[in-house]
Regions:
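Acidic ATP/Mg2+-coordinating residue in the GHKL
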Residues: 124
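Short helix-loop "hinge" at the ATP-lid/N-box region of the Bergerat-fold HATPase_c
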Residues: 96-98
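Short alpha-helical segment of the dimerization/phosphotransfer core of two-component systems
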Residues: 14-19
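Conserved micro-motifs of the catalytic ATP-binding
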Residues: 34-39, 76-81
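Short beta-strand/loop element within the Bergerat-fold HATPase_c
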Residues: 104-116
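A conserved beta-strand-to-alpha-helix junction within the catalytic ATP-binding
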Residues: 41-54
Length: 220
């Protein structure tokens, strides 16, 4: 195909991804705001860091932004929540950090284990926070969709997690989520937290959403 045709096809792909993301976020926000029941289950929060690690090569290639991960004292760390929503939370936080950065910028995703739970941090060296309270004023998330921060807050609220946004020392923003351990982590090591089939489906869904987000950020 000639250049104008390729450009038109690319524009269609991007707009389709944008509509799909907006619909997905709006539906999720509706479910969260209307208190639709959600079965909380034990899951290994360290899996979030592994998903961030898999995103890094595509992010650097497409956006020229480095995404670095770090785990400190974290092995298997079981918390209560909805794994799908935890992954959505991670994707929103990473996307916002990427949106704040220029090419050549850096994003850090770290997970630290504490006696009472785990702490996930997503930090960037981008433009930093607005002077207003970002949680109260719906800081722009996900390339201006204005849904992401409220989604993150509601996900954390119903799972019993704590979300905070602060200025990062040296510039940029730090988003932090504190996960309390599931019932003192009184779960036997041999317990299967989720089925292999369910994990495979969730992994594929997360990969698709991550690719979609990177595509949209590339045109932001």
């Amino acid at each position: 195909a000639d250049l104008p045709t390729r450009q038109a096809l690319s524009d269609i792909q991007i707009e389709s991804a944008r509509v799909s993301r907006t619909v997905h976020n709006a539906m999720l926000l509706y479910r969260l705001e209307n208190g639709e029941p959600c079965e909380l289950q034990p899951f290994d929060v360290s899996e979030l860091l592994e998903k961030a690690e898999r995103m890094a090569p595509d992010i650097e290639k497409s956006l020229e932004i480095q995404l670095m991960t770090e785990r400190e004292g974290v092995g298997r760390c079981v918390v209560m929540g909805a794994p799908d929503e935890a992954e959505q939370l991670l994707l929103h936080l990473i996307s916002n950090a990427l949106c704040a950065c220029d090419p050549g910028g850096r994003v850090w995703v770290s997970l630290k284990q504490r006696k009472t739970g785990a702490v996930l941090r997503v930090e960037d060296d981008g433009c930093g926070l607005m002077e207003e309270d970002p949680i109260e004023n719906n800081r722009r998330f996900l390339s201006g969709a204005k849904l992401g921060l409220r989604i993150c807050r509601l996900i954390c609220r119903r799972a019993g997690w704590k979300l905070t946004l602060t200025a990062r020392p040296g510039g940029g923003t730090r988003a932090q989520v504190a996960f309390p351990l599931a019932s003192g982590e009184a779960i036997p090591p041999e317990m299967v937290l989720h089925s292999g089939e369910g994990e495979a489906i969730r992994a594929a869904r997360f990969a698709s959403r991550a690719a979609q987000e990177i595509l949209l950020l590339r045109r932001y």
